[in-house]
């Protein structure tokens, strides 16, 4: 034979070996071959006696026919040929013909001329053949447990079934090589270790899925990585269901079921490659739930092919049945002890102890520990594992009730949509960084100033009044502030010549570390009064690092005010090297999250969006850990526009020793006590020119006129203004958004370029409106009171209150949009005779600013006072007092009504009206009021409950048909009989108690010497009748069950029906799509079948038609049905929540696509 031919033979045999090794990854014969010194790639001499004899001796050349060193290659090829012979000997299949026409076959089998078909078995190897090579014990043990599987063979190869081995223990064939006792002991140890591992993996997969696994893991080791080991196995043989058991075994999930909250109580285990790969990186697991000694490992089938492949990739031998695992401490390769195995050997007692302690605590406290765990403080953004555990507890508590109605699930989904709660922080448990907030060192000229001179300066500066002790003296120059030079340069470049009155008194107080309430008229420089001390405060601290929150926070009630503050601070932060972010609702939150992740020293925000960012991604976007300087601008409106609960949530999560600053142009008395709750550090109240006063530079005009004359008067005023001054700006206030848009249309028809500004417009439109208004492109803007706060527009000469403001503070802020920074302006207010209840507030504002009060207005106020005294009118509200909370409640009620209406449930008003009509009808007929309506409502709610029924599903449900009236009556009778059967145990208990009482009476009579023969006979008769009745009932139930089993072999012991017809389309699709159904079946072990068809709202199925869309859940175990129902409820809630969120983001869109 030539060397070229021999190499061809080797290449072919190597290819055949490659095919076999890919189809059976556990074929470790090559590694066993190398372990005995037969590696063909090592070029070294070997003793011929160490090899077993080959049947093809004509290939064993002992001489080197090639001179010049080629004999070494020839010996190398010979070794390869011998390896190929060994593999052919071990393989049960017949190899393909080689390039030279020879065919390899099973040793000892007769050669056949034709090819064997796939359905033909391979011939049995002879018992007395050539010495068999020693195979790897792992391979032998595998053959004893793994089911046979088809081998993917190359073309021309027809495999037969593998030879069966009679024993489940590793069999070492007789060979010419003797195995030492140490190696035999090692093989036996290895087999036992593999069997023990398989048993432990099966128990762990079953036990870890129980409901207590999460609580133990979170309580004992909340930060450790939870691992779940899933292995594919067959389900135990139980009563058949409507889904073929063999088909279920073929299903295999390749996804991670970590989000599944249902307990995997079934014995169906999943093979998860991702979870298996995690095992090799763990050195220690958290405390596990108790191991159930009742699990019978004999029912657990052998591992699947996929499990073999995963174990082979991990370097772990597949499990093998063996004896006890007492001494299982041998590793596969180097005999070192596996840390995981060592831990598993000692974990049983620890797990049992932990489980007993936890069960004892739960029974003693009744769940008090969970309440304490929820109330524990967690720093926002620092450790989110506890927060996730609390969310899981809440979700389990809400979804743990199997019998939830459809409206309950929808309410739960709506609740989750709005759920944006901040975790309450226990500040005593947090070690905050110390910070300095007292930077003010007055210069000599201020320090030497006497108290009388300081009071005189305050009086000259618009009559500054201060409430509080030890207030610093007012400053008169920018150089007195101690600001950085770069900051003073920006002040000089902006043209700020001297501090305004509020700045003169507020800045030294803030820089001394005091909390203040600053009240000053509009346009008096309040923004700079809190911005400049903030810059000095932030520069004194270390820079903000990634994943840290801001140092200073400014909260405003409106988006426009937040944008304006951000624009005013930009020249300063650029010069000082600081970063700031402006976040508000209406803008995409993704962009704002990106800005926050870049770190920001200062955040200007509206309260709602700030809470969104604090709760986004479990608090990982930003946090309040480093906040030491807090500003509430327009503080009175912060506690009035519905922000009070949101503001308090944020404030309660900021460190208590922070510095808090409140500013506003108006601050009513009723808001003072509410605001003082947030001031901690010796607060001061600084008021400039009165609490609610319009600036003296603003001319105030009030006109009393009817509604139909207001628009013509408006056109007259605009004509006079723009004839006199073309570049002037005009801001017109109305009370409603619709009124702003209507007035906009009327002015455009008259030829005036106008735009509207209110909360119903998109944020982009609002920003463009303000930009065009400031630039002069649009001279007139109609707006609601959303533009009354903080809007600063140059050349704004005229403000018109087209609709009168409803309280004095709103009037002051509206008028304050003009006359900014000492300029002149005009405010004209229209009031109708029907709005006389607002006349008193307007008069108070006019008198406070020493403006002229029209006689008509005074007469109107006097007339209203008389009506009020006579009880014919009601006084107007002050505009404050937390009306936003009521508005939130109204919004929630409206949302709930909309949901009930969408899903066919009447709202409370409709129910009340129906109940009233029903009561009237019953009053005529003599029926008790409210009886029928209550019964109808109760039956409707009970009909929507998801109840776990004992026994097989009704035939009408299985046949997918709606019952007729007579059939429903018979079904109701059967249900009543079932209810009576349920009540029988109680009756039996009563009879038993009566029987015991009679026996006691009998014994007492005997003790007194009475004749008890007749009484004893009566008692015996009663006892005999009771036993006969019990036996008859038992036999009847058995007969019914046998009869049903005979007619329907798929009948189960428990079933439940989940109606899904009334849920949104996405929710229905979520629970009925193929992947979800397969996952539910495998994770819960119950049979789930889709029944019925979809009916639109108001449509009911007729008798004989399919029922409404529903899911039929069946199983022989009640816990499996409960798990399936609970998981379906969770999916329905999540899908409905997603629908509600989508509708909230894109209201009014009904198509599949939205316009970006």
Swiss-Prot record:
Designated name of the protein: Pre-mRNA-processing ATP-dependent RNA helicase PRP5
Q: Where mainly located?
A: nucleus
Bias (Basic and acidic residues) ranges: 1-12, 71-92, 356-372
Identify the keywords attached in UniProt to this record, alphabetized: ATP-binding, Helicase, Hydrolase, mRNA processing, mRNA splicing, Nucleotide-binding, Nucleus
Q: Which Gene3D superfamilies match?
A: P-loop containing nucleotide triphosphate hydrolases
Name the Pfam families on file: DEAD, Helicase_C, KH_12
Q: Which stretches does UniProt call biased (Polar residues)?
A: 137-147, 252-267
Record text about domains: The Q motif is unique to and characteristic of the DEAD box family of RNA helicases and controls ATP binding and hydrolysis.
- Which GO terms of the cellular component aspect does the record hold? nucleus
- The Helicase C-terminal domain sits at 697-861
Function of the molecule: ATP-dependent RNA helicase involved spliceosome assembly and in nuclear splicing. Catalyzes an ATP-dependent conformational change of U2 snRNP. Bridges U1 and U2 snRNPs and enables stable U2 snRNP association with intron RNA.
Q: Which GO terms describe its biological process?
A: mRNA splicing, via spliceosome
Q: What EC number is given for this enzyme?
A: 3.6.4.13
Q: Does the keyword Membrane apply?
A: no
Q: Where in the cell is it found?
A: Nucleus
**Sequence motif: Q motif, positions:** 476-504
- Domain Helicase ATP-binding positions: 507-685
Pro residues biased stretches: 152-165
Q: Which SUPFAM superfamilies match?
A: P-loop containing nucleoside triphosphate hydrolases
Q: Where is this region: Disordered?
A: 1-177, 216-337, 351-390, 900-937, 1028-1049
Where do we find the motif DEAD box here? 633-636
């Amino acid at each position: 034979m030539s060397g070229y031919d021999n190499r061809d033979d080797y290449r072919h045999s190597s290819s055949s070996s490659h095919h076999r090794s890919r189809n059976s990854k556990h074929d470790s014969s090559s590694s066993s071959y190398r372990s005995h010194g037969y590696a063909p790639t090592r070029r070294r001499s070997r003793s011929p006696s160490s090899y077993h004899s080959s049947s093809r001796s004509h290939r064993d050349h002992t001489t080197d026919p090639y001179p010049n060193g080629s004999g070494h290659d020839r010996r190398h090829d010979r070794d390869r040929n011998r390896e190929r012979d060994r593999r052919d000997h071990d393989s049960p299949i017949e190899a393909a013909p080689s390039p030279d026409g020879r065919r390899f076959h099973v040793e000892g089998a007769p050669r056949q001329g034709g090819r064997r078909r796939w359905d033909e078995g391979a011939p049995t190897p002879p018992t007395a053949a050539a010495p068999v090579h020693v195979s790897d014990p792992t391979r032998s043990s595998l053959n004893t447990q793994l089911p046979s599987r088809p081998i993917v063979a190359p073309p021309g190869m027809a495999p037969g079934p593998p030879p069966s081995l009679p024993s489940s223990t590793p069999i070492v064939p007789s060979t010419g090589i003797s195995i030492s006792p140490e190696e035999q002991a090692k093989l036996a140890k290895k087999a036992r270790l593999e069997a023990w591992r398989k048993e432990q993996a099966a128990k762990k997969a079953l036990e870890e899925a129980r409901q207590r696994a999460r609580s133990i893991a979170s309580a004992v080791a909340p930060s450790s990585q939870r691992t779940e080991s899933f292995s594919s196995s067959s389900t135990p043989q139980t009563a058949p269901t409507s889904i073929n058991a063999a088909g279920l075994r073929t299903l295999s999930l390749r996804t991670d079921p970590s989000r599944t909250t249902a307990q995997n109580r079934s014995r169906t285990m999943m093979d998860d490659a991702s979870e298996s790969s995690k095992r090799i990186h763990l050195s220690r697991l958290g405390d596990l739930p108790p191991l159930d000694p009742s699990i019978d490992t004999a029912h657990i089938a052998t591992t699947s092919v996929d499990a073999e492949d995963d174990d082979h990739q991990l370097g772990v031998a597949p499990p093998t049945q063996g004896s006890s695992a007492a001494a299982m401490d041998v590793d596969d390769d180097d005999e070192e002890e596996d840390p995981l195995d060592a831990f598993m050997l000692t974990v049983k007692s620890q797990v049992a102890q932990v489980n007993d302690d936890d069960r004892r605590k739960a029974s003693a406290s009744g769940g008090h520990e969970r309440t304490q765990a929820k109330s524990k403080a967690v720093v926002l953004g620092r450790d989110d594992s506890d927060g996730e555990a609390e969310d899981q507890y809440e979700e389990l508590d809400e979804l743990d009730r199997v019998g939830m109605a459809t409206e309950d699930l929808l309410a739960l989904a709506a609740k989750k949509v709005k759920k944006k709660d901040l975790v309450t922080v226990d500040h005593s448990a947090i070690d905050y960084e110390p910070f300095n907030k007292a930077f003010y060192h007055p210069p000599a000229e201020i320090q030497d100033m006497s108290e009388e001179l300081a009071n005189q300066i305050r009086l000259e500066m618009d009559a500054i009044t201060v409430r509080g002790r030890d207030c610093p003296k007012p400053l008169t120059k920018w150089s007195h502030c101690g600001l950085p030079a770069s900051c003073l340069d920006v002040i000089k470049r902006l043209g700020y010549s001297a501090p305004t009155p509020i700045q003169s008194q507020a800045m030294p107080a803030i820089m001394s570390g005091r909390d203040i309430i600053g009240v000053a008229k509009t346009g008096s420089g309040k923004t700079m009064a809190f911005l400049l001390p903030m810059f000095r405060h932030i520069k004194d601290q270390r820079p903000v690092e990634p994943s840290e929150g801001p140092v200073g926070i400014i909260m405003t009630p409106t988006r426009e005010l937040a944008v304006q503050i951000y624009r005013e601070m930009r020249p300063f932060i650029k010069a000082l090297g600081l970063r700031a972010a402006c976040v508000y609702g209406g803008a995409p939150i993704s962009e704002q999250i990106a800005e926050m992740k870049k770190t920001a020293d200062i955040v200007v925000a509206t309260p709602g969006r700030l809470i969104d960012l604090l709760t986004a991604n479990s608090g990982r976007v930003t946090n309040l850990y480093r906040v030491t300087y807090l500003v509430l601008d327009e503080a009175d409106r912060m506690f009035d526009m519905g922000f009070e609960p949101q503001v308090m949530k944020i404030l309660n999560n900021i460190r208590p020793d922070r510095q808090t600053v409140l500013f506003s142009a108006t601050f009513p008395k009723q808001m003072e006590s509410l605001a003082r709750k947030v001031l901690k550090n010796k607060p001061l109240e600084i008021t400039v020119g009165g609490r609610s006063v319009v600036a003296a530079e603003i001319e105030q005009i009030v006109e009393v006129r009817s509604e139909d004359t207001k628009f013509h008067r408006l056109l007259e005023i605009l004509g006079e203004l723009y004839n006199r001054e073309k570049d002037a700006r005009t801001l017109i206030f109305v009370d409603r958004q619709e009124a702003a848009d209507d007035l906009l249309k009327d002015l455009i028809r008259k030829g005036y370029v106008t735009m509207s500004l209110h909360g119903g417009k998109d944020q982009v439109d609002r920003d463009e409106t303000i930009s065009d208004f400031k630039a002069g492109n649009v001279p007139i803007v109609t707006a609601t009171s959303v533009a009354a706060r903080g809007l600063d527009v140059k050349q704004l000469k005229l403000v018109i209150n087209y609709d009168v403001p409803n309280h004095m503070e709103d009037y002051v802020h509206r008028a304050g949009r003009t006359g900014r920074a000492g300029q002149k302006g005009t405010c004209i207010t229209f009031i109708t005779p029907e709005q006389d209840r607002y006349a008193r507030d307007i008069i108070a504002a006019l008198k406070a600013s020493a403006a002229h009060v029209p006689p008509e207005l005074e007469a109107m106020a006097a007339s209203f006072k008389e009506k009020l005294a006579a009880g014919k009118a009601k006084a107007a509200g002050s505009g404050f007092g937390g009306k936003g909370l009521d508005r939130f409640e109204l919004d929630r009620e409206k949302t709930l009504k909309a949901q009930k209406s969408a899903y066919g449930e009447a709202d409370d008003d409709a129910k009340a009206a129906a109940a009233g009509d029903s009561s009237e009808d019953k009053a005529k007929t003599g029926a008790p009021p409210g009886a029928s309506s209550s019964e109808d409502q109760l039956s409707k709610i009970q009909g929507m409950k998801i109840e776990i029924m004992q026994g097989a599903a009704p035939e009408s449900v299985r046949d997918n048909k709606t019952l007729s009236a007579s059939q429903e009556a018979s079904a109701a009778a059967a249900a009543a009989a079932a209810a009576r059967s349920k009540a029988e145990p109680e009756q039996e208990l009563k009879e038993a108690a009566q029987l015991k009482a009679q026996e006691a009476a009998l014994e007492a009579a005997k003790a007194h010497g009475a004749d008890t023969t007749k009484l004893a006979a009566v008692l015996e008769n009663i006892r005999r009748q009771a036993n006969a009745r019990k036996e008859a009932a038992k036999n009847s139930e058995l007969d019914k069950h046998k009869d049903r089993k005979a007619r329907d072999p798929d009948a189960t012991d428990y079933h439940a029906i989940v109606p899904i017809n009334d849920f949104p389309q996405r929710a229905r699709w979520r629970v009925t799509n193929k992947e979800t159904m397969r996952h539910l079946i495998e994770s819960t072990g119950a049979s789930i079948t889709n029944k019925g068809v979809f009916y639109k709202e108001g449509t009911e199925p007729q008798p004989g038609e399919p029922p409404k869309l529903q899911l039929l859940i069946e199983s022989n175990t009640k816990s499996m049905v409960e798990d399936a129902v609970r998981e379906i409820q969770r999916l329905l809630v999540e899908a409905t929540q997603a629908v509600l969120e989508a509708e909230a983001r894109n209201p009014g869109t009904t198509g599949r696509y939205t316009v970006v």
